[in-house]
A protein has these predicted regions:
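Terminal, non-globular segments
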Residues: 1-184
């Protein structure tokens, strides 16, 4: 019982931080930096859950965070957000099972790739499903990819520290997964 209480507390804090960072990105960032593109810090948190949680837990937590972000800070339909997250999860999990090494360097490159993939998948789904699809906005999206990558290492270190503080070994799949990047 104690373990599931810590696991719930761990996710509750992560959800609260995601909510606050998404709020910062959508409101306060523009007060400080004008129209300069904001990093998608919430996407780094979702990536962390994709990489460091068991698949079932990860997808449920990601869907909850997608609902939270979409309902509070986005005009995008929840179905599109969930479809994008499902496609991202499928690709990230597939790559993770082929090669994965825990640490900030892997997370940095995964963040760059996931953010780029997020934009590509989002644009494609928007073009296919929406009557008024999202624009390409190439320079804005490139800036978001770069800034999200740059903020990924501090995000990773904070989330890893939180997992250690909350002693959430059950949630942390990397603790039980062997390093598949090594050649035998």
């Amino acid at each position: 019982m104690q373990t599931s209480k810590f696991h719930f507390l761990n996710f509750l804090v992560i959800a609260l931080v995601t909510f606050l960072l998404a709020g910062f990105q959508t409101t306060f960032w523009f007060q400080l930096f004008g129209e300069f593109p904001a990093p998608l810090v919430w996407l780094n948190i979702i990536l962390y859950l994709m990489l460091y949680r068991r698949p079932t837990e990860a997808i449920l937590e990601i869907y909850f965070l997608g609902f939270l972000i979409s309902a509070a800070y986005s005009a995008q339909p929840i179905g599109i957000i969930w479809l994008v997250f499902f496609i991202l999860f499928s690709i990230v999990y597939s790559v993770k099972t082929r090669f994965f090494w825990p640490g900030p360097r892997y997370f940095f490159f995964a963040s760059l790739a996931t953010t780029a993939l997020f934009h590509v998948v989002f644009i494609l789904i928007s073009q296919l499903l929406e009557p008024n699809p999202s624009g390409l906005l190439f320079l804005t999206r490139m800036a978001e990819i770069i800034f999200t990558g740059l903020i990924s290492i501090p995000t990773f270190l904070v989330l890893e520290k939180w997992d250690r503080i909350s002693a959430d070994e059950l949630a942390n799949e990397s603790a039980t997964q062997p390093n598949t990047a090594e050649v035998e």
